[in-house]
Amino acid sequence: MAQLLREFYELCEGGVCQDLLTEAEKREIRENNAMFITGKLQEGGVLNGNQRMYPPDIMEREVKKYSEMVKDNRALGELDHPESSIINLANVSHMVVDIWMDGPAVMGKCKVLATPAGQILRSLVDAGVKIGISSRGMGSVKEHQGQTIVEDDFQLICFDIVSEPSTPNAFMALSESKLVNEQVEKSNKIINLIDSILRD
């Protein structure tokens, strides 16, 4: 019987991810104060903290399907992890803007939205809170050699922001947003100083 399956992950090992921002996203950060977070969203083939294992081929299939939602700007996630298979738009905090496989790991990039839940998420990140990510999906499980294996009927619903991920190294990290904003502020100060000197 299909059931709601929720998995928790830290987003980046040590809280630091490689620079995954495009030039357009960096410009959006500078011009619109946008915020992006990146990291590991899920992992296939390993036993997680919930004692479940997602076969890699199932994860690859679901990432391929989910990438269509990403392309259509419909890959939304909530702040916290509800016990529902339906995304509540009132609680949406972020939108997945990129997703890909890196070996057995599902990697992704999320844009923090200007919703009430997104503002809470932004405040947490700005305060240095280490946030995790959790997958939410529907599917059956079976017991095999002492492990709980997710079966082929699994359907990925979304990725939610959580405080306690169940899989190591599924913590999200700020994708240069703060660094880019600090560089813009410094550049603006220099430009203002030069303008002030030239006017005098």
Give the positions of each predicted feature.
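Short, charged/polar surface micro-motifs in flexible loops or helix N-caps
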Residues: 44-46, 83-85, 114-116
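Short, solvent-exposed loop/turn motifs
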Residues: 51-53, 85-86, 148-149
